[in-house]
């Protein structure tokens, strides 16, 4: 485990791009304005299919806002806050234990689909303390090998080049169709919810 602190939020997401592109598991975190500054880097990661985890401990806004808890970054997280029609899987923990569980799973989802994954908590969860279980049984995924990673080819294969630049419109269209298929697959396979006292309900409202 290696931890790095950068003076600028933009540097953090660019470090994540480089680390994720080399096949390393990487996470960057900040609160709402800091994550807003990372959006350019997140869309680069989405376009280049670089897996990483982005943790947002949400606080009130807009602007500098407040340090108090908030859930106001929903659209920025779920609809893609940077340029282009990209999407990211989003986990939204409701407790400290769920934050631990979902961050662990977020790394697996990022690797399985080669995508940045958002974890959105709020300032209340960010400041809470409770006993957590790191050893609980978790969903086991058959993760693909990272043969796409740019980690040094040692003259044994063609170098892997990872970027999000497609100068020919046909190439970009083909790439975006591929991404949209991936987002549809994530939508179909990765939805999570918890039912509570809904057995006899005629109508259920779902909100965040």
Residue ranges of predicted features:
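Conserved thiamine diphosphate
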Residues: 69-122
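Short acidic, glycine/serine/threonine-rich loops at helix termini
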Residues: 15-18, 38-42, 63-70, 101-104, ...
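Single conserved hydrophobic/aromatic residue that forms the stacking wall/gate
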Residues: 1-13
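Thiamine diphosphate
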Residues: 63, 67-70, 83-85, 181-208
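A glycine-rich helix N-cap at a beta->alpha junction
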Residues: 6-7, 49-61, 141-148
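Conformationally flexible catalytic loops at phosphate/diphosphate-handling active centers
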Residues: 114-195
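A short, small-residue-rich loop immediately preceding and capping a beta-strand
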Residues: 19-37, 51-56, 92, 204-207
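Acidic, glycine-rich active-site loops and adjacent beta-strand->loop/helix elements
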Residues: 10, 30-36, 42-44, 56-63, ...
């Amino acid at each position: 485990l290696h931890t790095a602190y950068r003076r600028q939020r933009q540097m953090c997401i660019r470090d994540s791009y480089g680390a994720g592109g080399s096949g390393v598991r990487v996470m960057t975190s900040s609160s709402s304005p800091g994550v807003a500054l990372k959006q350019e880097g997140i869309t680069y990661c989405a376009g280049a299919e670089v897996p990483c985890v982005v943790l947002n401990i949400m606080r009130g806004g807009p602007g500098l806002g407040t340090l108090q808890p908030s859930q106001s970054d929903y659209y920025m997280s779920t609809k893609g806050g940077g340029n282009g029609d990209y999407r990211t899987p989003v986990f939204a923990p409701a407790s400290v234990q769920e934050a631990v569980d979902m961050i662990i799973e977020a790394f697996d989802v990022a690797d399985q689909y080669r995508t940045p994954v958002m974890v959105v908590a709020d300032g209340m969860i960010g400041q809470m303390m409770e006993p957590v279980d790191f050893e609980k049984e978790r969903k086991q995924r058959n993760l693909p090998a990272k043969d796409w990673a740019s980690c040094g080819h040692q003259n044994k294969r063609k170098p892997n080049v990872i970027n999000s630049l497609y100068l020919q419109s046909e190439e970009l269209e083909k790439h975006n169709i591929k991404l949209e298929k991936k987002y549809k697959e994530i939508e179909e396979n990765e939805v999570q919810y918890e039912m509570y006292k809904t057995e006899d309900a005629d109508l259920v409202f779902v909100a965040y």
